[in-house]
Swiss-Prot record:
Membrane topology classification: Peripheral membrane protein
GO CC entries: chloroplast thylakoid membrane; proton-transporting ATP synthase complex
Keyword entries, A-Z: ATP synthesis, CF(1), Chloroplast, Hydrogen ion transport, Ion transport, Membrane, Plastid, Thylakoid, Transport
Entry's localization field: Plastid, Chloroplast thylakoid membrane
Protein role: Produces ATP from ADP in the presence of a proton gradient across the membrane.
Pfam family, one: ATP-synt_DE
Protein name (database record): ATP synthase epsilon chain, chloroplastic
Species this protein is from: Ipomoea batatas
Any coiled-coil regions, as ranges: none
GO MF term list: ATP binding; proton-transporting ATP synthase activity, rotational mechanism
Length: 133
């Protein structure tokens, strides 16, 4: 038995196919979803989506949004998403280093919050690459 997974951003469909299982980062922690999961709606955190296709796992960096699960269908609506295999590792590492430097020199509450979000996004992209290496 499989699940129908659809990952959407405002600009494109990132994923639309059958999967065996997913592990989703939510605001209250990670949840595993198998076929016949109870219906839920949840906020999606900045983090990694792990997708199992038969014996292979695929990763995707998600940048926050919402997910709806029901009737063996999962719809994930996020601000942005990238498959781990599509992320340039050198560019992602450079972005992470810049985000870390910006976080260290952030002044004031607003700058600190914005720098922290940029840092979390950069770390997630690097983690998505490393999870498939």
């Amino acid at each position: 038995m499989t699940l129908k997974l659809c990952v959407l951003t405002p600009n494109r469909i990132v994923w639309d196919s059958e999967v065996k299982e997913i592990i989703l980062s939510t605001n209250s922690g990670q949840i595993g979803i198998l076929p016949n999961h109870a219906p839920i709606a949840t906020a999606v955190d900045i983090g990694i989506l792990r997708i199992r296709l038969n014996d292979q796992w695929v990763t995707m960096a998600l940048m926050g949004g919402f997910a709806r699960i029901g009737n063996n269908e999962i719809t994930v609506l996020v601000n942005d998403a990238e498959k781990g295999s599509d992320i340039d590792s050198l560019e992602a590492q450079q972005t992470l280093e810049i985000a870390e430097a910006n976080f260290r020199k952030a002044e004031g509450k607003r700058q600190t919050i914005e720098a922290n979000l940029a840092l979390r996004r950069a770390r997630t992209r690097v983690e998505a690459i490393n999870a498939i290496s």
